[in-house]
């Protein structure tokens, strides 16, 4: 049997390797239109900034390696230009000789990947305008920086790649400006969490323009939709990718609602003996069960392995994704998984939201705070999604949350996890456990939370309420929320009789713990509706800083 794979980066080579492990007699051929194969695309920003010493470290395998180890024939600079699914014939163009020939397959895998989206604006074809999608892109950028030595750069788009390149250009001493058409950076995050990223960028000397689109590139400048001109000798578009589906559409392969190739759990398309995997396919979301398009290298490798297994008689089955992502920008780690608050509400979940600010380990051993935002279904208690920003231990916590969401855990389950503890590694109540405690109290034990946005709405509503700052008087005097009164936690029991039990009460402290203690006192003394401010004054002041 002859298996042909179109594409030799993450998914295609993963499919080939798994197919060979399952079947030694199978003939495996891969056509790849690029010159590089099986490379680490996610490492490219770090080569540009010098963290990766040599480009060869990102391209450790060549066609000779796959021939020797897996007996797979990889033909680079060969583009498949058409598929005849009835005759099982491909037309292939040799990009070096410009000749076209045909090849026959018994089984076919499309691993055609995705391409950078570039807005159709004037000047995008200028020599100083780049995208970063493959090794050739990376080499062009590196050569340009080495030769032209730009002093100013503009990056259009603030997704993972854009921010990673931003950091690495800044390390080279280049002045960087970020341009984002949305009103926040990192569009995958909720806006309140994105503000932590924005604040960190600005503290590291990055200029950020939000709600602004590039409309024209003229020489060494970018013109924005409001007429602002940004000087930049180097310009990078990091405005997302779209799946490469031209071949699939021409062959009659079904395209899903997300615009990517529709596949089943074994990576089969609607056409007999044709499979697809990697960044060209749509996935489905573990929480909602609905189609999503989230191209990631980890998912590409996974779906490639599944395709290679199923095409050779295996039983691997795709179980969906959560859209888990993580990146670093100037020592800050940002991670997310599952549904954001915005996405959960769009799916009509009644959500409970908490902001848990805790160190990754005891402060006496140098622990550093992280902010964990967790979203749960108020009706069932199921954990729906988590976002984290912090300096240490973020990767460890997000992976625990990923596991929990993947297996349908409820918030109370987090408290019962037997997580590893010793002071060099964690606190006695790990931030994961504490997140579960907060949400369990909110959903099942009447300790309701109020987000900063909800408090702002309450303050503007005209409804009668009392806002209690339960911190010490010195902390209150230093900074407090505008309409708050100060009743320190130590004095609240004696003062509770002066409060109207029918009036909404909102408590807060610095991060939430003492606010919760104050909430308990009020509830246990008959105040009927009491909320604790999620994330306390520390989180509220972050939002207030940017809103004002």
What are these model-predicted stretches?
Residues 1-73, 77, 166-189, 324, ...:
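Beta1-alpha1 glycine-rich phosphate/pyrophosphate-binding loop at the start
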Residues 59, 152-154, 160-216, 295-299, ...:
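Rossmann-like dinucleotide-binding cores of NAD(P)H-dependent redox enzymes
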Residues 104-113, 232-240, 304, 381:
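Short hydrophobic core segments
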Residues 110-172, 207, 263-265, 487-491, ...:
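Glycine-rich dinucleotide-binding loop and its adjacent helix/turn
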Residues 125-149, 220-223, 229-306, 400, ...:
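FAD-site-proximal beta/loop scaffold in flavoenzymes
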Residues 412-466, 473-506, 510-548:
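Rhodanese-like catalytic fold shared by cysteine-dependent sulfurtransferases
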């Amino acid at each position: 049997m002859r298996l042909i794979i179109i594409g030799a980066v993450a998914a295609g080579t993963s499919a080939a390797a798994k197919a060979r492990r399952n079947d030694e007699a199978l003939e495996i051929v891969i056509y790849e239109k690029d010159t590089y194969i099986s490379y680490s695309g996610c490492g490219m920003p770090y080569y540009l900034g010098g963290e990766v010493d040599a480009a060869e470290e990102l391209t450790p395998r060549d066609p000779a390696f796959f021939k020797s180890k897996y007996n797979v024939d990889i033909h680079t600079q060969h583009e498949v230009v058409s598929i005849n699914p009835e005759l099982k014939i491909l037309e292939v163009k040799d990009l070096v000789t410009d000749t076209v020939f045909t090849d026959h397959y018994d089984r076919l895998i499309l691993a055609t990947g995705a391409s950078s989206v570039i807005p159709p604006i004037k000047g995008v074809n200028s020599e100083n305008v780049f995208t970063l999608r493959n090794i050739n892109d990376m080499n062009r950028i590196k050569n340009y920086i080495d030769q032209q030595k730009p002093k100013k750069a503009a990056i259009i788009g603030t997704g993972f790649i854009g921010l990673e390149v931003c950091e690495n250009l800044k390390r080279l001493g280049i002045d960087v400006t970020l341009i984002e058409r949305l009103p926040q950076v990192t569009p995958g995050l909720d806006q309140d969490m994105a503000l932590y990223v924005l604040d960190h960028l600005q503290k590291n000397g990055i200029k950020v323009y939000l709600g602004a689109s590039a409309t024209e590139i003229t020489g060494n400048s970018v013109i924005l939709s409001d007429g602002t001109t940004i000087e930049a000798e180097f310009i990078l578009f990091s405005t997302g990718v779209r799946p490469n589906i031209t071949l699939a559409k021409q062959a009659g392969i079904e395209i899903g609602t997300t615009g990517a190739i529709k596949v089943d759990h074994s990576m089969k398309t609607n056409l007999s003996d044709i499979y697809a995997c990697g960044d060209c396919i749509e996935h489905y979301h573990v929480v909602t069960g609905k189609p999503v398009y989230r191209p990631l290298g980890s998912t590409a490798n996974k779906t490639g392995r599944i395709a290679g297994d199923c095409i050779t008689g295996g039983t691997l089955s795709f179980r969906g994704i959560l859209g888990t992502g993580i990146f670093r920008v100037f020592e800050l780690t940002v991670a997310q998984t599952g549904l954001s608050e915005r996405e959960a509400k769009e799916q009509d979940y009644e959500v409970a939201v908490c902001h848990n600010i805790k160190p990754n380990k005891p402060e006496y051993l140098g622990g550093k705070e992280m902010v964990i935002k967790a979203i749960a279904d108020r009706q069932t208690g199921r954990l729906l999604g988590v976002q984290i920003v912090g300096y240490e231990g973020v990767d460890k916590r997000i992976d625990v949350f990923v596991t929990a969401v993947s297996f349908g855990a409820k918030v109370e389950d987090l408290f019962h996890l037997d997580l590893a503890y010793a002071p060099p590694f964690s606190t006695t109540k790990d931030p994961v456990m504490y997140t579960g405690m907060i949400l369990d109290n909110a959903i099942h034990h009447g300790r309701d939370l109020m987000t900063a946005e909800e408090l702002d709405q309450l303050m503007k509503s005209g409804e009668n309420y009392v806002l209690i700052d339960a911190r010490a008087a010195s902390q209150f005097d230093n900074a407090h929320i505008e309409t708050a009164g100060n009743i320190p936690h130590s004095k609240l029991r004696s003062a509770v009789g002066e409060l109207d039990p029918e009036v909404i009460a909102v408590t807060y402290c610095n991060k939430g713990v003492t606010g919760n203690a104050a909430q308990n006192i009020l509830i246990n003394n008959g105040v009927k509706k009491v909320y604790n401010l999620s994330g306390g004054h520390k989180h509220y002041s972050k939002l207030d800083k940017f809103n004002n």
